[in-house]
Amino acid sequence: MPRDFPLDRVRNIGIAAHIDAGKTTTTERILFYSGVVHKIGEVHDGAAVTDWMAQERERGITITAAAISTAWNDHRINIIDTPGHVDFTIEVERSMRVLDGVIAVFCAVGGVQPQSETVWRQADRYSVPRMVFVNKMDRTGADFLKVYGQIVDRLKAKAAPIQLPIGAEGDLSGIIDLVANKAYIYKNDLGTDIEEAEIPADMADEAAEWRAKLMESVAENDEELIEKFLETGELTEAELKKGIRDGVLKHGLVPMLCGSAFKNKGVQLVLDAVVDYLPAPIDVPPIQGVLADGSEAVRPSDDNAPFSALAFKVMADPYGKLTFVRMYSGVLSKGSYVMNSTKDVKERISRLVVLKADDREEVDQLRAGDLGAVLGLKNTTTGDTLCDPDNSIVLETLFIPEPVISVAVEPKTKGDMEKLSKALTSLSEEDPTFRVSTDEETGQTVIAGMGELHLEILVDRMLREFKVEANIGAPQVSYRETIRSSSKGEGKFARQTGGKGQYGHVVIEMEPGEPGTGFEFINKIVGGAVPKEFIKPAEMGMKETCESGVIAGFPLIDVKCTMVDGSYHDVDSSEMAFKIAGSMAFKDGVKKCNPVLLEPMMKVEVEVPEDFLGSIIGDLSSRRGQVEGQSIDDGISKVSAKVPLAEMFGYATQLRSMTQGRGIFSMEFSRYEEVPRNVAEAIISKNQGNS
C-alpha cells in the first residue's frame, strides 16, 4: 500500500499550553477549517471533538492527549491536543516525546503562566522545535507585545513576531503578515471570508519596524542571509520563509503568531505556519536506541529501514485495549508479529487504526512518521519499544514523574472487590503516574497520583466506566526518608531451635547517595567472609527495608550501602537468614546516620486582585510557605511561593472564600525538602502508632 503523503509533507505536532489558554478551541478550529468536522464544537458547551471523555466534557478541561489526523495544503497533519492542568503532566510529557513540533498557545491577557513554563521545559527536554500562537486577542486586556516580552524574559526564548494584530479586544479586525508584508482583514464571523489588503496606514511604521527586527533575527541564523541583509537591508518573502524554517529547526528562532480561535481569526494562518515552519519527521535527528549487544544505534525516518515504534499511551476502549504508537522507522502491517524489546516478548498486531478523536479509521499499515493505534497488544505498556524481531532495538523511553499524593480506596460492597481490582489494573496500564499498592500493615488498597484532581478524575472514571462504587480515604502525602551522615550498620540473625538453625551476619557502611539515585548497593566482600550466594539475599533484605522505611514507614531515598564484612555457618546459613540479617544491618545503620523525613514541596502561584494580597501572603505563611516573589500588573497581584503539599489540601475552597471567588492558583511539584523537626516528630509518632 503506497503512502498517501510523502514523508516531507507529514507534520506530527502538539498543541500545548497552560489551562484556559484555548488549546482545545484552537484544535477545534483547525479541524473545522481543514474539513475534519463540519460544525464548530465549543469546550464550554461540552462539544469539543478532542475532549471525548465524559469528565473532560463536563469540566471543560482536556485530561488525556487525543490524537487526530487532518490535512492542509497537501500536507498530512497529525495533532495531539494536550492537557494544561499540572495534575496531567504525564500526558504532556508523553506527547512531547513523540512529536516533531509544537504550537505553544498563550492567552493574550494572562501571558506566561506557571504551567506554560512547565510545558516549555518539557519541550526543551525533548528538543522539540516550536512556534507560538497568542490566542484570545479579542479579550479585554489582550496585549500581544506584552506576551512577547514575557516569553523572552521568563522563558528565555528567541521569540520573533511574524504577525501583528490589527486592533485588539473587541476591535480585532485582522492580522498583519510581516513575512508577506500584507494584511488579512476578516469579513465574516466564521472566518471564511478573508480579504488580502495593504497594511493599514496608521500601522505602517510599526509594521516596518517589526519587519526589520524579524529580518535581523532571521539573518542571525544564516551567514548568506546576514551578508545580504547588511548590504541591502532587505530580504525577500522566500528568503524570510526559508530563514524562519531553518531557525525553527535549529532551535534558534520561535515564530510568534496571534489571533482569536474563539472568534475564528488567525487559525488558517497557524495552519500555513505549521506547513511552512515546523519540521517533517525527516527534518529531526533520527531516533536513538540501544541494540541487543548494548551498542548505540539510530533508526532513520524511512519506510525501508527496520521497523521501530514507541508505545506512548495505552487506553481502555469499548473494543479492547488501544495502544498508541509513534512510528519511527519501517512499516507495521496488520496481522504481523513484532518484538516488544523492552520486555523481550513477541506481540501480534490484530488491527491498526488512525484516530479522529472518538471516531476511527481502520488501516492495513502504519509507516515511518505516522501516529496511530494498535489493537490486540497484551503485554505492551507506556514507554515500551516495538520493533522488527530480526533487528531488535530499545528506543529512548519517557521520563515518568513520581506521584506525590495517595488515598486509600475500598469497594462499598464485597461484590465490587473484583471489579475494583480490574478497574485499577486497567487505569494504571493507561497512566504510568497512577500507582496501585497494598498497605501491608492494614491490607488496604492505596492509589497514588499527581494531585487531588488527578485522583478525583480516576475515581470518577472507576464509577462511570467500570461501575465500581468505592469509599475513598483522606488524601495522604507521599513522604520520603533519607539519611544525612555516614556510619556502619551490623545485623546478626542467629536462631537455634533444635536440628538445623538459622545464621546470617552482615556488616555494611552506609552513606548518603547522590540525589535521585534511590537505593545503591555495592559489594566489597573479600576473602569469602560471606559466600557469593548469600550476597544477593542480603541486598534484597536491605532493599525491601529501604522501600518500607525505618523511622516512619516511608520509602528511603538516596542511600548508598556497601557490604564490607560478615560471617556465615556451613550448616545453618541460608538465603532467608542473610535476607533478615541484611534488613537488620540496614535498620541499624539508618538509626546511626541522622535519619530525616522529607516532604514534597509545591511551586504555588496565586493570582488575586490587589486588595487581597495581604491576606493571601499571611495565609501562605501560616501554611509553612516561603514567598519567593510577587508582582502587580493591572491591579492583579501574582504571588509565587514554595509550600509543603501537606498544607495545601482544601486550598482551592479557602482561596475562593478569602477572595470572594476572584482568586486563582496553580500548583506543581518542585522537589523534596526536609520536614521541620517539630512537624516530623508528629508525623513519625502518628505513623509508629499506626504500625
Curated annotation (Swiss-Prot):
Quote the CDD domains the UniProt record gives.
EF-G, EFG_III, EFG_mtEFG1_IV, EFG_mtEFG_C, EFG_mtEFG_II
Annotated binding of GTP, by residue: 17-24, 81-85, 135-138
GO process annotations (BP): ribosome disassembly
Entry-linked SMART domains:
EFG_C, EFG_IV
Sorted alphabetically, which keywords does the UniProt record give?
Cytoplasm, Elongation factor, GTP-binding, Nucleotide-binding, Protein biosynthesis
tr-type G domain location? 8-282
- Family per UniProt? Belongs to the TRAFAC class translation factor GTPase superfamily. Classic translation factor GTPase family. EF-G/EF-2 subfamily.
- Protein name according to UniProt: Elongation factor G
The organism encoding this protein is Synechococcus sp. (strain RCC307)
Record lineage: Bacteria, Bacillati, Cyanobacteriota, Cyanophyceae, Synechococcales
